[in-house]
Amino acid sequence: LGLGSFMATSAKAETTQEASFAAASALTDALQLALTLEYLEDEYYRLGINTSGLIPAADKVVFQQISKHETAHVVFLKAAISSLGETPIAKPNFDFTAGGNFQPFTDYQQFMTLAQAFEDTGVRAYKGQAGNVASNKAVLQAALQIHSVEARHASKVRRMRMNKGWVESNNGGNMPAATNAVYAGEENVTQAGYNTSTLFGAAAGSASFDEILTGQQASMIAGLFIS
């Protein structure tokens, strides 16, 4: 009985330790992904506001403020990763033309198109990683705070482009096909087993609930702009 009890206790301790390591790894991976996305947005807006003649004066103040937010997010995430005893990933080399498909720093409309795509990606990506940062309450709180700010960015940029401030179905609005991956899955109308389109219709049902992006999906989208 004593040996059996010891073995059971040891197995439980080992399982608990393995779960703890898994949670720590998931937390770090989530933060590194978030840092990659924030690096992307931070550099994008910095380049945009420093490109002479690109952004109209009336809009520039908006992007200057968004840029400040993204820089603050980068600083926080690097500090959070370091506090966990890990090394923050280095900032990648970005190609915001995505291999020549976009010219955001010579065409303001394209600049805003990618701004919307990046912000909508960020909103879904943070939501997708919530479970992976739940093991650390301080990080979870900060991640949720960043998530809500990213949602405000997305809504503002969408309205600047004459779109609704929210996403309906998998239609990003007046967006090119090259951004389809950002909105894939947003057409879902079933939440916790309930079909929200039953009472409200598919457009309202899908718009009422944002969908997540998995880490793999978010990394794939970001990877399109990493050289």
Residue ranges and their predicted role:
Residues 2-227:
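All-alpha RGS (Regulator of G-protein Signaling) helical domain and cognate RGS-like helical scaffolds
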